[in-house]
């Protein structure tokens, strides 16, 4: 077997089963365990593969409310505000964005009271000029990952 696209094939195998053993990956990819180990180590060292985490169903664990927060922030305070949001365990995604708002954050909450507590805390910050909150009614797709193309095309 040639090693062309081996890293892409390895990532795709891991997307299918992040707990696969080096032996099973080697068998599936028709290469040696050492080759898989070396390529995987390189992917980890380069930051292309960052850990092996379970996909958690927060709703099953009592986090029934997903909220999307959009914030207008004083420009110089952007790093501070995004850092504050990242510091809250319920915030699963925090983005600096273009458009009408500066920050978009997605959070998981046990109920609307839990959500409101965080929103009130955030709005007490003078650097947040405006906010908009939407509650997700139904997650049509969430935490989706996609297989990489073998030819390098997106």
Swiss-Prot record:
Keyword set, alphabetical order: Activator, DNA-binding, Repressor, Transcription, Transcription regulation
Its annotated function is as follows: Transcription factor that regulates multiple target genes, including those encoding enzymes involved in amino acid synthesis, central metabolism, transport processes and other regulators of transcription. Acts both as an activator and as a repressor of transcription.
Residue ranges of domain HTH asnC-type in the record = 3-64
- Look up the DNA-binding region in the UniProt entry and give its residue ranges: 22-41
Query: Which biological processes are named by the entry's GO terms?
Result: response to amino acid
Source organism (scientific name): Halobacterium salinarum (strain ATCC 29341 / DSM 671 / R1)
What GO molecular function annotations does the UniProt record carry, in alphabetical order?
Answer: sequence-specific DNA binding
Q: Name one Pfam family in it.
A: AsnC_trans_reg
**This protein's GO CC annotations:** cytosol
UniProt keyword Secreted present = no
Q: Which domain of life is it from?
A: Archaea
Protein's name in the database:
HTH-type transcriptional regulator Lrp
Q: InterPro entries, per this entry?
A: ArsR-like_HTH (IPR011991), AsnC-type_HTH_dom (IPR000485), Dimeric_a/b-barrel (IPR011008), HTH_trans_regulator_Lrp (IPR053535), Tscrpt_reg_AsnC-like (IPR019888), Tscrpt_reg_AsnC/Lrp_C (IPR019887), WH-like_DNA-bd_sf (IPR036388), WH_DNA-bd_sf (IPR036390)
């Amino acid at each position: 077997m040639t090693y062309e696209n081996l890293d892409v094939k390895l990532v795709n195998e891991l997307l299918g089963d992040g707990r696969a053993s080096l032996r099973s990956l080697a068998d599936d990819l028709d290469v040696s365990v050492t080759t898989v180990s070396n390529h995987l180590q390189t992917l980890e060292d380069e930051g292309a593969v960052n850990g092996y985490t379970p996909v958690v169903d927060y709703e099953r664990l009592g986090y029934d409310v997903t909220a999307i927060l959009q914030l207008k922030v004083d420009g110089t305070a952007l790093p501070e505000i995004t850092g504050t949001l990242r510091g809250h365990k319920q915030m699963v995604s925090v983005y600096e964005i273009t458009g009408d708002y500066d920050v978009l954050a997605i959070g998981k909450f046990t109920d609307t009271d839990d959500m409101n507590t965080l929103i009130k805390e955030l709005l007490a910050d003078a650097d947040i000029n405006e906010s908009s909150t939407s509650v997700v009614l139904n997650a049509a797709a969430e935490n989706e990952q996609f297989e990489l193309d073998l030819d390098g095309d997106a």
